[in-house]
Amino acid sequence: MCGRFSFSPVIRIIEERFDVKVDKTQYKPRYNCAPTQNLAVITNREPCEMKYFRWGLIPFWAKDPSIGSRMINAKAETIREKPSFRIPFLKQRCLVPADGFYEWKRAGSKEKIPYRITLADRSPFAMAGIWDRWKDPEGRQFYSFAILTTAPNELLSGIHNRMPVILSRDQEKAWISDTDPAE
């Protein structure tokens, strides 16, 4: 499970790497992005602008927003089957920019050792995400997201049994396009 990540590049690097406009008044480097925080995403609806959504998907049909704190990740293998994720997977996809993520390896029955995982060159990358919009009883809108996870690659399999879906640059464009996400 991906439960923490970092996103700390300077604005110029973000704008060049993701071809987006960054609101300088909103962006702050984050070294410990955590569930329920408002974090940067790039959506299929507005792919040229960085938005800030709450981490923890609140489905549009939820009666209470607290469900979101339990839905920070979505398994890529079963995403089409889960009612909370099915519509966002088909229509509301996003990139979750990062420059590292954290996984904890169990060492014995009580201890966990944290690992920060980055690309070899430490450059920013995008994790696949889905988003949704929820309205509270007063009509206020809240935007939230979840990160897709998959089985770990060979490098991570000794640390954890899941990892975020990390997209190549070509996959990023396809992920936030209007094409079928399964392609």
Task: Give the positions of each predicted feature.
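Short linear sequence motif anchored by a di-proline
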Residues: 1-183
